[in-house]
């Protein structure tokens, strides 16, 4: 029987779930995850306790609860459940209040922007920009890009671009490097004016072949020798052009995005 883990929040639960994944990944154990977002009333808090207690009875062991409930009364209700309750706000906010000699707002949902805030609008603009400039489909307004990711097809450019846009409000375009570029020995002409914005992604040729075979099995496009050729040529071009790059083979999208932000000095987010 897998241990049951509840993610309880008065908002979307994204913060609590991210934290929970980071903690639980330290254990060689699978868990059954139950998300309980928008617990923004006492009635919902009591209903959540019922769910937690039912899981404890079913599992024959108490549940584990990660909570980011801001309302102290709701939090106290959840803490009376048959569970190990890990209260992230109490653990971190109270010591910060003492250190800063300030009281926190204790307002629900402050960690996520509302639709009418400038931060939210910036993020939506960045997402629209990244979608419009995915895989080199448009050169229009490329000068507005914060970063332009380059690399061979299926090296991780699209998911990284969208993650940068959604998570950080970064206008990230991406552009493929194709065999014709390698034959010319030059970057695509559309990228020439923006060399300072370029960041490259590479990948292990064998892994690239596996990914491409899922899309076009048995094709030259997916053949190991072709993948080796494209990767070797792409990396040589990036070195020649002075483009910073990394291998996406063993890195998560989060790690790739964080490295890019550091390398191109886009670590500008404030709170």
From Swiss-Prot:
Enumerate the UniProt keywords alphabetically. Answer: Kinase, Nucleotide-binding, Serine/threonine-protein kinase, Transferase
Gene Ontology MF annotations: ADP binding; ATP binding; phosphotransferase activity, phosphate group as acceptor; protein serine/threonine kinase activity
Signal sequence residues? none
Give EC number(s), comma-separated.
2.7.11.33, 2.7.4.28
Task: Name the top EC class.
Answer: transferase
In which organism is this protein found?
Answer: Burkholderia cenocepacia (strain ATCC BAA-245 / DSM 16553 / LMG 16656 / NCTC 13227 / J2315 / CF5610)
Name-wise, this protein is Putative phosphoenolpyruvate synthase regulatory protein
State the function annotated in the UniProt record.
Bifunctional serine/threonine kinase and phosphorylase involved in the regulation of the phosphoenolpyruvate synthase (PEPS) by catalyzing its phosphorylation/dephosphorylation.
The similarity comment for this entry is:
Belongs to the pyruvate, phosphate/water dikinase regulatory protein family. PSRP subfamily.
Q: Which HAMAP family match?
A: PSRP
Catalytically driven reaction(s): [pyruvate, water dikinase] + ADP = [pyruvate, water dikinase]-phosphate + AMP + H(+); [pyruvate, water dikinase]-phosphate + phosphate + H(+) = [pyruvate, water dikinase] + diphosphate
Q: Which Pfam families does this one have?
A: Kinase-PPPase
Chain sites annotated for binding ADP: 151-158
